[in-house]
C-alpha cells in the first residue's frame, strides 16, 4: 500500500529515505481504514517490515536474456528449466508513480505457459554462480512477468537442482546439461 519512486535500491542512503517515507505513509492509510472501512474503527499498526521491498534494480546479463516476445509467444526452449510459467505483465513506471506507459498491462495474449531457459540462470562472466528468482537475465518488461512468486519458486528449484547436479558430477554449473535438470524436475 505504501509506495515510493526515484529510489536507487543499491544505495543505502536512498534505502533509508525510502523506509522512512513509506513508514510515514502508514499513518494516513490507518486513518483511512478507521474512517471508511467498517470494522477497522480501532485498527492500528503493530509493526512494519524491517526492510523496504525493492521491485527492481540492476539486471544481470545471462547467457540468454528473456524477452516479452518469448513470454507472449509462449516460446518453448530446448534447455527449459521452468515450464508452464504464466502471469500477467505488471509493469511499473521506473521514472515516476503509477503504471508503465507502454500498455503492457493490457497486452496479455499469452494463452499457455511459457518456458524459461537454463541460460537465463547462468551469468555471462561469473563462474560458480547461478541466478534465480527475480534476478535472472531478462528485460525490464519480461521481469514484470517472471518476478511473480510461483515462477520464482520454480526458478529456485531449478537452480538448486542444477547446483546439486554440478556438485555431484564435479563440473561447473555452466556445464550442467539442462536435460539432466529436466529429468529431475519432471
Per-segment meaning from a language model:
Residues 1-186:
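Flavin (FAD/FMN)-binding glycine-rich loop and adjacent Rossmann-like elements that form
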